[in-house]
């Protein structure tokens, strides 16, 4: 038995015989009277010729199934608890750097086309395109800009119309004098073209008017009287008196 084992170890070209020597505990046809093969004699007998062929792990021993490539395996591996990993690609976030994340994702999943499937890859690419640089996002930005511009224009138009209405209302607020008030004012104007502050106060109290209303009426009446006189320039005395009257009289609303 020891000679057969040593002969198996010396021959480097005997593949099947060497494998049979190492695997089978019994030799050839004799199975009853021969003791089982043990590894202890190999460890004890350190022969020189045996040391030359000690590296037989790659030829004699059967390699593990995972040592061969996937194509060379005779039987496919079956694992009960193994689940196929689903590739999930998160949609690329919109950034200002362009489509660099999308290109990197497309290159990374290019080798997994057969296993992951074309549908998921198409979904990932579609998600990548839904960023700031996608064709659908550009019209949305333009629409928002146009809507904001229209809102500003409408606001400006409303403000201008409100200002115009307020100006019109301010201009339309005119005092409607009665016939009795006009008669008293005309009588006073024939005697005094310019009123003192005390006299203006008395007229306002008697006619139920404000001092400002009396003052404005006398100013308008003087302008009308000057136009009626034939366009003669007013004397400096009249202009100074008019200015003093306007400055001395407080405006009462």
Swiss-Prot record:
Q: What happens when the gene is disrupted?
A: Defects in somite lineages. Secondary trunk myogenesis is reduced, as well as appendicular and hypaxial muscles and their progenitors. These cell types derive from the external cell layer (ECL) and ECL cell numbers are reduced. The endotome is expanded at the expense of a second somitic cell type. The resulting increase in endotome-derived cells that migrate to colonize the dorsal aorta generates a dramatic increase in chemokine-dependent hematopoietic stem cell (HSCs) induction.
What are the DNA-binding region positions? 170-229
Region spans: Disordered:
136-158, 226-253
Where it sits in the cell: the answer is: Nucleus; Cytoplasm
Cite the CDD domains for this sequence. homeodomain (cd00086)
Primary localisation category: nucleus
What keywords is this UniProt entry annotated with?
Answer: Activator, Cytoplasm, Developmental protein, DNA-binding, Homeobox, Nucleus, Repressor, Transcription, Transcription regulation
SUPFAM superfamilies in the record, alphabetically?
Homeodomain-like
Has keyword Cytoplasm?
Answer: yes
The UniProt entry's GO CC annotations, sorted and at most eight, read: cytoplasm; nucleus
Q: What does this protein do?
A: Mesodermal transcription factor that plays a key role in somitogenesis and is specifically required for sclerotome development. Required for maintenance of the sclerotome polarity and formation of the cranio-cervical joints. Binds specifically to the promoter of target genes and regulates their expression. Required for hematopoietic stem cell (HSCs) induction via its role in somitogenesis: specification of HSCs occurs via the deployment of a specific endothelial precursor population, which arises within a sub-compartment of the somite named endotome.
Q: What is this protein called?
A: Homeobox protein MOX-1
């Amino acid at each position: 038995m020891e000679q057969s084992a040593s002969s198996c170890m010396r021959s480097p070209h005997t593949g099947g015989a060497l494998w049979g020597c190492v695997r089978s505990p019994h030799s050839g046809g004799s199975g009853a009277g021969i003791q089982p093969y043990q590894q202890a004699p190999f460890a004890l007998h350190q022969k020189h010729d045996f040391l030359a062929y000690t590296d037989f792990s790659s030829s004699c021993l059967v390699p593990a199934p995972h040592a061969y490539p996937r194509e060379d395996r005779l039987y496919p591996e079956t694992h009960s608890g193994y689940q196929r990993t689903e590739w999930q690609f998160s949609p690329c976030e919109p950034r200002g750097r362009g489509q660099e994340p999308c290109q990197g994702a497309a290159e990374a999943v290019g080798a997994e086309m057969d296993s992951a499937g074309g549908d998921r890859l198409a979904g990932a690419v579609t998600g990548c395109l839904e960023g700031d640089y996608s064709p659908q996002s550009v019209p949305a930005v333009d629409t928002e800009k146009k809507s904001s511009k229209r809102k500003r224009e409408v606001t400006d138009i409303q403000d201008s119309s409100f200002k115009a209405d307020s100006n019109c209302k301010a201009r339309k607020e005119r005092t409607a004098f009665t016939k009795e008030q006009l008669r008293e004012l005309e009588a006073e104007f024939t005697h005094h073209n310019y009123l003192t502050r005390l006299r203006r106060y008395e007229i306002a109290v008697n006619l139920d008017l404000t001092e400002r209303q009396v003052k404005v009426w006398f100013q308008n009446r003087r302008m009308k009287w000057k136009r009626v006189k034939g366009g003669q320039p007013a004397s400096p005395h009249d202009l100074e008196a008019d200015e003093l009257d306007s400055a001395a009289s407080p405006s009462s609303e």
